[in-house]
């Protein structure tokens, strides 16, 4: 089942005790929040389209076959170019949707998190 977001959509493909696999699609020109996660790592495998990946202080162009490993608390973002961007995301660790700290967001979703939310 697809879950729609302002930037596109994702499908949950598989879930285990300490992992989660999603297929993610960003619509042309859209991007994720600049964000990090406190309790999980992510591995991205690009399968369609192209875009720009921000990882830490680096920006890298991506295309099908590109892979990225994002560490715990590492700032990251994906941005789609003109044809969109689709990739698989494999999360390892505590895989909860609310484990997202947004630093910048095009859709007005940045906010100060209550202390309890930060301790997920």
Spans of model-derived segments:
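Short, surface-exposed secondary-structure edge patches
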Residues: 23, 43, 58-61
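A generic "binding-loop/recognition-motif" signal
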Residues: 30, 39-40, 58, 74, ...
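Double-stranded beta-helix
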Residues: 1-5, 77, 81-120
């Amino acid at each position: 089942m697809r879950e729609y977001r302002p930037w596109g959509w994702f499908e949950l493909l598989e879930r285990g005790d300490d992992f989660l696999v999603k297929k993610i699609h960003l619509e042309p020109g859209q991007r994720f929040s600049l964000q990090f996660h406190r309790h999980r790592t992510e591995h991205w495998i690009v399968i369609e389209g192209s875009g720009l990946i921000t990882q830490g202080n680096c920006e890298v162009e991506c295309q099908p076959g590109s892979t990225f490993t994002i560490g715990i608390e590492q700032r990251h973002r994906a941005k789609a170019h003109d044809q969109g961007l689709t990739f698989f995301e494999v999360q390892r660790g505590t895989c909860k949707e609310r484990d997202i700290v947004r630093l910048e967001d095009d859709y007005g979703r940045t906010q100060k998190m209550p202390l309890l939310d930060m301790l997920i």
